[in-house]
Amino acid sequence: MVEADRPGKLFIGGLNTETNEKALETVFGKYGRIVEVLLIKDRETNKSRGFAFVTFESPADAKDAARDMNGKSLDGKAIKVEQATKPSFERGRHGPPPPPRSRGPPRGFGAGRGGSGGTRGPPSRGGHMDDGGYSMNFNMSSSRGPLPVKRGPPPRSGGPSPKRSAPSGLVRSSSGMGGRAPLSRGRDSYGGPPRREPLPSRRDVYLSPRDDGYSTKDSYSSRDYPSSRDTRDYAPPPRDYTYRDYGHSSSRDDYPSRGYGDRDGYGRDRDYSDHPSGGSYRDSYESYGNSRSAPLTRGPPPSYGGSSRYDDYSSSRDGYGGSRDSYSSSRSDLYSSCDRVGRQERGLPPSVERGYPSSRDSYSSSSRGAPRGAGPGGSRSDRGGGRSRY
């Protein structure tokens, strides 16, 4: 592709290597005023490469000089004089530099692509950071089937700001297990367990579907129950036991329980804020103990559909509901005995249940009875919660 250089610029080729700028200026200066004489030299040897460019102030003078001097001899060599085009070397220097430059931007784009790869890199690096968040998110929310869809925001926030999303992914994805971010309110006060909790949840997920069924059952059974006054009264000691000794199982069950409590929007957040961790931790632990037997005594593990779940609990509410007088004594006996029977049926030695500190037994009797019967019925009315469950 031959482009004409600027008007008034002449290309002089076939020069003797001895010809210099002064000789050119002398020869061509008689046609008009010369603006520039450019003798092309070898970079290394600094010798003339045999051609030059002479730029006249007036394009008309350049045309005259080209017409007269083309083919004439200069310093013993016939020279070629014509309107300068952007020669290949100069295209190489100016033209191709745009290609290099234009290739540069593609390289920049490649860098842009690589850059997006780069930006993809940091998020993926963040992703690795987040892999903690994501894998937790996966594990925890995978223990509750549909939630990963709802947990979409943590991954999205994970993309742009991995560092932020890793913690929020932690809290939110661990709350993702429960299904709602609001529990991060309740849960932030327990900064420890959410981080420890992914492992149990992973254990839940992969241990057996039945166990997971039970843990969801726990979450619902204990969902209704942490609101009983008994659990709040007894909260502090069991919190010490469950948080320290049974942290995994209790925290595992606690978070589903509080997750579902929060998810159902029954104001459980307030219940939890009333007795922040003790009740629900202990309760979830109790429900964990019970869940292994209670589902057996109640029937099949809950289906994951909402209606049967609520039917189950509404029936359990009706079945075990009533005044605190009735459930506090008889129901506690019933459930503690059911617990032992269920453990024996499942092949768990009864001693497992008795092996925990004695305070747990005393609390388990009251809370095991109290939550079951009292959750919606006794304790809610007792707490003056005139709100209808539904």
Curated annotation (Swiss-Prot):
RNA-binding protein which may be involved in pre-mRNA splicing. Disulfide bonds: none annotated. PANTHER family: TRANSFORMER-2 SEX-DETERMINING PROTEIN-RELATED. Residues 107-120 have a biased composition (Gly residues). There is a cross-link at residue 80 (Glycyl lysine isopeptide (Lys-Gly) (interchain with G-Cter in SUMO2)). GO terms for biological process: mRNA processing; positive regulation of mRNA splicing, via spliceosome; RNA splicing. The keyword Ubl conjugation applies. The keyword Phosphoprotein applies. Residues 62-390 are annotated as: Disordered. Residues 8-86 form the RRM domain. According to some authors, RBMXL1 is a RBMX retrogene on chromosome X which is likely to be functional. This is RNA binding motif protein, X-linked-like-1. PROSITE patterns: RRM. The modification Phosphoserine is found at residues 88, 161. GO terms for cellular component: spliceosomal complex. It is found in: Nucleus. It comes from the Eukaryota. GO terms for molecular function: RNA binding. Keywords: Isopeptide bond, mRNA processing, mRNA splicing, Nucleus, Phosphoprotein, Ribonucleoprotein, RNA-binding, Ubl conjugation. Residues 158-169, 323-339, 354-371 have a biased composition (Low complexity). Residues 62-80, 194-215, 241-274, 380-390 have a biased composition (Basic and acidic residues). SUPFAM superfamilies: RNA-binding domain, RBD. Its main location: nucleus.
